[in-house]
């Protein structure tokens, strides 16, 4: 449940998040397994998994929900090989090349035949709603995956006025300044990893790990018109993360000191541990995110 990534969206119009109402709405779009001819299924599951029956998990006004996507695995190479075999056989039999539409029909028949025997791949994506802060957080590795889940939530709720939380000032400009000067806002510290890209279209990319970021070597790249597009940071010795120029937060790691605070809860009481960990994570993110966006120069006005 601890988020590993954080795609941050902000609510840009007035909307009420009612946990009881949302519970009913999510149930209407509950995940059901793929049937024999389904290529994929996408729906909501219990936020606590097998440890809870409710679709939502709520602490104060914060709401956690979870989407599950199941996809049938049909390798393109398998479909292509089957199609080529059938096309060759039919063209030999009829003594003429098949038309494009005939090949497309054959391909659909092959997919229909393979689907019932295809393996499935499933993944879960958590969404955290922070009404007081006006944020919706998606634990996804890309904005594309986050948008897919938010599209499902928008369909579920009927309306979801959110936009990516992108600071007014270009993130890469701020990150470059931090590395160039070696100075970061209070509470933030540079770690030893970064990515720099040339401002020229055909310029190079430098990726460095276990590197002193304020060294002459790194500064020479900045002097040669490269900007920092990814930067590993520490916040108050409680969070480590990699911030990208699109404001996405990856490889989010909560400190052991924080995560160990609930070790007094018996391991067999997993529901209680889940709830306690959720409260800890929410408290941390509720403090961290406003601090981060303030450090990045602030977000534009919601109606801007």
Swiss-Prot record:
Q: Which cysteines are joined by disulfide bonds?
A: none
Q: Which UniProt keywords apply?
A: Cytoplasm, DNA recombination
Top-rank lineage group of the source organism: Bacteria
Q: Output the Gene Ontology terms for molecular function.
A: double-stranded DNA binding
Q: Give the GO biological process terms.
A: DNA recombination; regulation of DNA recombination
Return the GO cellular component terms, semicolon-separated. Answer: bacterial nucleoid; cytoplasm
Compartment(s): Cytoplasm, Nucleoid
**Family annotation (PANTHER family):** RECOMBINATION-ASSOCIATED PROTEIN RDGC
Q: Which NCBIfam families match?
A: PRK00321.1-3, PRK00321.1-5
Say which family it is in: Belongs to the RdgC family.
Q: What does this protein do?
A: May be involved in recombination.
What is the official name of this protein in its record?
Recombination-associated protein RdgC
What is the source species?
A: Vibrio vulnificus (strain YJ016)
Q: Which gene encodes it?
A: rdgC
